[in-house]
């Protein structure tokens, strides 16, 4: 029997009807211990962002408004506006569908990278719960250029993030869409310098000590593909 396990289904477009069993991961539950937050895979991602703020734990503000479920978040290593979920993951709990047992992955074992993780390569693992390590003190992440550099508190930061998102993407509850699925190309410094010489207005960001991200949105606009 073929089966598909889905989260909230916000990134799914079906070409044809599925033949088999469709299972919605609806594992719920949010709990806290000191600065750790545990959330069931069936919770909505944005609900745990607001729940963290309600419990005076900080760090997830820049990930506000991302559609989808908690269980999907580490698979893609979701990120936005200078933050990624991998910045906060303590561990990911999974159920191995082939071996019939629970398996827990530490942050390092998740093999997180830019919009990637070990879970993309292991479809037999059903994510059941995640544990996030958050901060008891708010420190605004304002690396994204459009964000105000001075922020009063975490709720203002969240408000700013939601405002930016609303300008870039339609509300998926009113106009269904799969959001932004383009990855920013990662290139070497030498390639970036060549691009800057040809296109001085190009938008780029530091990725690590040797590589840079080029804005996919800028490239799409430049090629009139929007």
Where are these regions (language model features)?
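Phosphate/pyrophosphate- and phosphate-bearing ligand-binding catalytic cores of soluble enzymes
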Residues: 102-226
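Anion-binding (especially nucleotide phosphate/pyrophosphate-binding) glycine-rich loop
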Residues: 1-92, 96-98
